[in-house]
Amino acid sequence: MLAAGLVFTRTARSQDSAVHYIDYPGTVGKVQSLPWDGVPKWATLDVQLRGRLEGQSSDNFISGNGRAYLLTRNYVGLQVRPTKFLTGYIQSIDTHALGLPLTYVAANMRDTFDDRQAYLDFHMKNMHVIAGRQELKYGGERLVGISDWTNNSRTWDGFLGRIGDKNRLDVFSTSVVAVHPTSLDTHGAGLTFHGAVGTIGTWVPHMAIQPFVYIKSFPRVQSQQGIFGTETITTPGVEAAGNIPGGFDFDGLIAFQRGNYSNDSVVAYAGYIKAGYTSQAAFLKPRLLGEYDYASGNTRKDLTKINTFDQQYPSNHNAFGLTDLFGFQNIKQERINLDLTPAKRVTVLLQQEWLQVASRFDNIYSGSAGTVVKAPTTGLLSDDIGREFDASAKWAINDYVVMNVGVGHFSPGAAMRENGHGAPLTLGYMSLTYRFKVGHKGTASAP
C-alpha cells in the first residue's frame, strides 16, 4: 500500500520471498540495530513486538454480539554463524488474545511460548539447502504465505533447496505446522506440501515472473460419496507483476488444479488481475487500482468431480476486504482501491469490494477455508455475498515504530441474509509494531 512497485530481495534465506508486492500489507519501517559487544561476533538477537487492539460489532454475524480485545505477539530470534557455509536460526513466539473469552479465541490468536522457527541453512555462493522449521512465502502470498496479519503466523517443517538469486529456483518438501495453544506445535504425519517455484527477475525489463507448481497430499480424506481414500492435488500456475512507463503497474496470477480427493477427481482454477496508475506529481500522489478475483466453486453437475478451488496456504488478510471474512474459494470479487500519501511517513488506503459466489451450488467459505454458509441441495437463491467499504492508514512514527489503523464495514448480500447471516459487521483496529536486533558492533545483520 506504499508507492507502487516491487522489491527484489538481496539475500537468500528461508524467510525471503523472491518478490515482495506492495499490495500485501506487510510490516513497513526499519529494524533498529542496537550494537552490544557482549554478544559474540557470530551471533545476532532479533525481537519483534506487536500489539493490535480490535473491535467488531457482530461476531459470527449475530447482531449485538460485539467484542473488543487486544492481540499481543512477541517474536524473539537468535541467528548463529558458526562457519562461512552454515547459518542457524531459532525463533520463539508468544501470542495472546487479551479480553476475549476462550470460547471466542480462534486458532490463529493464541500460542503460549512456542518454537516458531528452527532451521539450519547450508549455503555456498547462490546455493542454499535449508532444513527445519521455516517460513514459505511467494509472490503476493495469495497461495503460499505466512499470513503475518494473524497473531500466529504460519511456518512449515521440512526442507528447501534454492539455486540462484534474482533468477532462481526453489524446490521444497514440507508439512505445515499446526498450532497448539498450550503445548508444543507440531506438524502432521509425513511431508504433505511440496513445490517448485521459479523466479525470473531480470529477463523482462520492469517485470518479475514466477511460474510454480504445488502438490498437496494427505493420506486420508472422505469423498462426496463418503468413501475414504488419499488426496493428491497438483496446482500449476504463474504470477507476474511489473511497472509500465507512465506510472502504470500490474499484478496477475492464474492457477489450475487437477488431482484426486479419494475417488473424486479435482478440476478447479483461480486467478486475479490488478492494474493501477500512480500520479507522482499530483497532490497526495494518488494511486488508483482496479482488481478482479475469481476462484471456482463446485457446480454439482458431476457428483464424482470437485470444482472447488483449494486455496492452499495463503495470506488472506485484505484479499477480500479488511474484515477478512472470506477465502479464495468459490468467490468472485470486483474491487477499487485508492492509495494516498498525505505525508512522507503516512499512507492512506480507501477501497470498495463487491463479492459474489462463483457457483450457487457450493458453500461460502471463510479465510481459513471453513464453511460460512452451507449451500442447500438446490443451491443458494442468490450469488450476492455482499459488499464492503474499508479505510486504513499506516504511519511510520519513526524509523522503527509503525502504527496501523483501519475500519471495515461489511454489508451482507442476499446469499448471506437468506441463510441466517444478515447482520452487518463493522471491524476496527489499531496496532503498533517495533522491531530491533542486538549484535556485536560491525557484525552481519540478523534476519
Question: Residue locations for each model-derived region?
Answer:
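N-terminal periplasmic/intermembrane-space "pro-region" immediately following the signal or transit peptide
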Residues: 3-66, 77, 81-83, 284-292, ...
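C-terminal beta-signal and adjacent terminal beta-strands/loops
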Residues: 13, 396-423, 436-442
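Signature for the C-terminal beta-barrel architecture of outer-membrane proteins
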Residues: 16-20, 125-129, 147-302, 336, ...
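Outer-membrane beta-barrel "beta-signal"
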Residues: 19-20, 423-447
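Extracytoplasmic loops and strand-loop junctions of Gram-negative outer membrane beta-barrel proteins
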Residues: 27-31, 57-62, 101-103, 141-144, ...
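Structural signature of outer-membrane beta-barrel domains
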Residues: 52-56, 85, 95-97, 136-138, ...
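Surface-exposed loop and membrane-interface regions of Gram-negative outer-membrane beta-barrel proteins
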Residues: 55-72, 82-126, 138-149, 222-224, ...
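Outer-membrane beta-barrel signature, preferentially recognizing the C-terminal barrel domain
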Residues: 190-193, 313-341
